[in-house]
């Protein structure tokens, strides 16, 4: 009886190795598709998996073929429209499948739809936040923030061909072949000794000699059938993410909820902050987040109230900056904490309050924070708050500002603000 043993450790994901290779090969196209898909999601559905589509021509394999130009002679079967020696005009286009869908219908042409496949939540978030980091992160005395880095972690029985360990695989192959053939080799050695004795004995024992030769041949065949290398022998270099202790950090999220912020603008601000929250919680451990909502008055709130409260009012931006300054002095010593802030507003502010915002940031907040980002969400012309902040940007290296006009700008602006910097952090 023949037994088939499934040694694959992937279980239901039997093509995991091929899947990982595919994700690496077409990472650029997948990231482009993800950046387009993130803007189409609802606010509460940012961290689930995603159906990714890639143009078919991007995944086509290179091949040699004749060019489409030049003069060709071909033989086609005749029909009621063409007869011998007729010349057929070359087609002038008319592909289908990946077209825009605009224009007149045609009876000619063919094409291929885009290749669509599903990626998991983890794969989606890994690609979404790749190459992002908190800027100017400083090593402080108390260490609680944990960043995960990839390290070698021995060997594993499954992996991608690029990580295969030839030496360890051959060692396993030798051990397996030795274990599977040791008993047969001892038996073979004993039979060969008996055959030598019988062959030299008198009188000759032909039947016994023939039986021994047959058993020896069968044993040798069994030994030779043991494969030199088996999938069970293969070992791959294993890598795992290990916590890398770093400095503790706090992120202040300041959101304008005044009456000038319509629902569409608030939704874009929420999308930005949800991306920020997912990035912090997935990339770092023990990062504290302080949520501040403001109109004419500022208030520190919890996560649920920050995203879903319907409270609104007038606009005094300095109230949020004053509250942040109070919280920093009360709970977050700059010598022990890396302090970050992200402020989102439509730029509409009481005119006399904008210079006060400039003063609070310049004298109190920017000297103690590692990085302060301001996002203005509006399609109107910039007002006094933006102009005051432009002076800060030219003076302070740890201040950045970006403009969001519609949903398509959210993810590119987010990556621009938090892209990983090669330069060393300042002290």
Curated annotation (Swiss-Prot):
Compositional bias annotation for Gly residues: 92-102
Region (Disordered): 87-110
Pfam families: DUF444
Family the UniProt entry places it in: Belongs to the UPF0229 family.
Matches recorded under NCBIfam families: PRK05325.1-2, PRK05325.1-3
Protein name: UPF0229 protein YeaH
Source organism per UniProt: Escherichia coli O6:K15:H31 (strain 536 / UPEC)
Classification lineage: Bacteria, Pseudomonadati, Pseudomonadota, Gammaproteobacteria, Enterobacterales
Gene that this sequence comes from: yeaH
């Amino acid at each position: 009886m023949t037994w088939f043993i499934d040694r694959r450790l992937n279980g239901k994901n039997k093509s995991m190795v091929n899947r990982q290779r595919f994700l690496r090969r077409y990472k650029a196209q997948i990231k482009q598709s993800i950046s387009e898909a993130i803007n189409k999601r609802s606010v509460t559905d940012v961290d689930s998996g995603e159906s990714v589509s890639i143009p078919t021509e991007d995944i086509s394999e290179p091949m040699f073929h004749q060019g489409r130009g030049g003069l060709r002679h071909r033989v086609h079967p005749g029909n009621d429209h063409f007869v011998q020696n007729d010349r057929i005009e070359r087609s002038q286009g008319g592909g289908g499948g990946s077209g825009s869908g605009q224009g007149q219908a045609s009876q000619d042409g063919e094409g291929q739809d885009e290749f669509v496949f599903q990626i998991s939540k983890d794969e989606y978030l890994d690609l979404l936040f790749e190459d992002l980091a908190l800027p100017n992160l400083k090593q402080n005395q108390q260490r609680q923030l944990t960043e995960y880095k990839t390290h070698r972690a021995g060997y594993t029985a499954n992996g991608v061909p690029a990580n295969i360990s030839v030496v360890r695989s051959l060692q396993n192959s030798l051990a397996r072949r030795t274990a599977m053939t040791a008993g047969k080799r001892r038996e073979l050695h004993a039979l060969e000794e008996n055959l030598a004795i019988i062959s030299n004995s008198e009188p000759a024992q032909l039947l016994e000699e023939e039986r021994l030769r047959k058993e020896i041949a069968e044993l040798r065949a069994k030994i030779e059938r043991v494969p030199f290398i088996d999938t069970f022998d293969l070992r791959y270099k294993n890598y795992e993410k290990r916590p890398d202790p770093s400095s503790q950090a706090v992120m202040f999220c300041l959101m304008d909820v005044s009456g000038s912020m319509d629902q569409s603008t608030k939704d874009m601000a929420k999308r930005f902050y949800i991306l920020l929250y997912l990035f912090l919680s997935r990339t770092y451990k023990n990062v504290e987040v302080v949520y501040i909502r403001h109109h004419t008055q500022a208030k520190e709130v919890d996560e649920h109230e920050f995203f879903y409260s319907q409270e609104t009012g007038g606009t005094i931006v300095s109230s949020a900056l004053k509250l942040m300054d109070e919280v920093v002095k009360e709970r977050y010593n700059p010598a022990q904490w890396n302090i970050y802030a992200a402020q989102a507003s439509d730029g509409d502010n009481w005119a006399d309050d904008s210079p006060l915002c400039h003063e609070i940031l310049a004298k109190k907040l920017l000297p103690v924070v590692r990085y302060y980002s301001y996002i203005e969400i509006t399609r109107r012309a910039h007002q006094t708050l933006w102009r005051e902040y432009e002076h800060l940007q030219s003076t302070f290296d740890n201040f950045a500002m970006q403009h969001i006009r519609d949903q398509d700008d959210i993810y590119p602006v987010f990556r621009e603000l938090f892209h990983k910097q090669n330069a060393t952090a300042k002290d």
